[in-house]
């Protein structure tokens, strides 16, 4: 039934709507003075039965209710990245998400479950080993430079010459490290 103004005061059942989404939030009785309309954010049209996981949303233009999926407050996971997505709006879930959370690092979605992505883990470990190797090479070069200066100027002490040889040997051994075997690397000991 559509609301019609009246010359008489009356009390009618109304269905309250949440401003912004027009979703049903409850019902109650409203006193309607003569020659006035319904209170803001309400209708006198009863909502349909609302199944779990849905809300009733009122379309003011059509004067009708629609059932809309409601996953707000829940977390889903992007199947491409594994990133958590918090659902904060009404409507169906975004495409390419799952309710299942990835267990740990280096997981990929196989269409039905998260599985270990050994290739991604291997590449990560290789990049990590390359970064470690580069950092250690920089440390070695920083130690070698002043010692080499002293040797070139023929003012190096016996201890400096010994340290220079140790650091150069370390740098050569470090340079031979094969980072493609990332998890099995035995790093040379610092001098």
From Swiss-Prot:
Q: Where are the transmembrane segments?
A: none
Q: Which domain of life is it from?
A: Bacteria
Q: Give a Pfam family name.
A: Caudo_TAP
Q: What is this protein called?
A: Prophage tail fiber assembly protein homolog TfaQ
Mind telling me which InterPro entries this protein's record contains?
Answer: Phage_T4_Gp38_tail_assem (IPR003458), TFA_Chaperone (IPR051220)
Family affiliation: Belongs to the tfa family.
